[in-house]
């Protein structure tokens, strides 16, 4: 990060709070094309390579230096033809470069904060799978859960004001307003899920979304830690901060006295309250009674409405009993089920049997939505019957097999934490047979004839990494028995940073 800091001359610009001049640097767009620093943001931009070239960037920067006002109304087609450029492409390029500049600024502030507090940064916690061991450890001991849809700000100017606490360059903020006006209806009073997770410029919208959510989560985390003695102890953290982790002398009570009525300002001690955020949603889970869960619900709604200026209705937040409710969580169906075990004990001449019931987190593959995703991309029909991928029939045999293998292994890799592997085997069966039908269609043959000619080597290619390891460790004779016995266990990986489109069926 220090190398990028010197290369991008951020020190010199940040002394005067200027980030705007960096938008004229060519290497900013090169970093945007390279999907961020150190591949920190793993987003697939399909077709991006066809649109990116040094000539386009040079032409774009030249137009900015000449102060050509190319952000014109989309209805003014005559002016657009006269200037002779693709307005949408240029505006997207500039917004991507702007996002990289702000990301670098945030990263440098975060690194300096971690160094000041001597906090060790764990890259393993970035993995999506890292949350599931936490749920396995905590959720079996909890009673109630609430799946909450995080509300959105009522106007886009709120997003700009949130970013203003971290970016003090007024020119950059005006440029951000221009992007929001281009990509979305600025006069709209209600934002939506489609806005924040739009595929037109995901990096910019995810940056705005995370900065918006980070504000209220920072407050929620602090008040959770101070819940039992908030009125007795004054804290030095001021939430309407200008810098990232600035601390000043105002106590928390003075800040929140203007935002919350007196009845909301008292809190209760709850050491079993857990909060998890994912894909625009959050989970509140607790061991307490429904009454205390309702208090947390109304507190959260008041926090959103009074401090973050978003509208949320308490009636849309449902509190469910964890033992009778399934969570649609990050591509898994998660629920708590009793795990019965029988223990035979013997004392002298008497023996007795004891039944022990322990709660366990059950993670299942959502087979119906996943088959729907496969049917949507033409690997099977709506009933789950494999069909040939006709659009891939013109590719070489190696490319066809490689594409199917990558999809199969990615799905197996992600769903390796499933409690039951049967559904996963069905998905792999669909992909295997779809691959065979695609190859048979290309060679104008039947699946049976093509499989006889190729042999069983093709099916062995679809083995996952776990199956390959077991086949190497154990002898071939005992492999089948060993595989069935040991492969039922769940495996969580710490290198999964993004969700495949097939898994993200929402």
UniProtKB/Swiss-Prot annotation:
For the biological process aspect of GO, one term held by this record is: tRNA processing
Record-linked Pfam families? Intron_maturas2, MatK_N
- Protein localization: Plastid, Chloroplast
Subcellular location, principal: plastid
Q: Name one GO molecular function term.
A: RNA binding
Question: InterPro entries per the record?
Answer: Domain_X, Maturase_MatK, Maturase_MatK_N
One GO cellular-component annotation of the UniProt record comes to: chloroplast
Give the record's keywords alphabetically.
Chloroplast, mRNA processing, Plastid, RNA-binding, tRNA processing
Function in brief: Usually encoded in the trnK tRNA gene intron. Probably assists in splicing its own and other chloroplast group II introns.
Q: Which HAMAP family match?
A: MatK
Name the family the entry cites.
Belongs to the intron maturase 2 family. MatK subfamily.
- The protein, known as: Maturase K
Q: Which species is this UniProt entry from?
A: Prunus dulcis
Question: What are the top taxonomic ranks of the organism?
Answer: Eukaryota, Viridiplantae, Streptophyta, Embryophyta, Tracheophyta
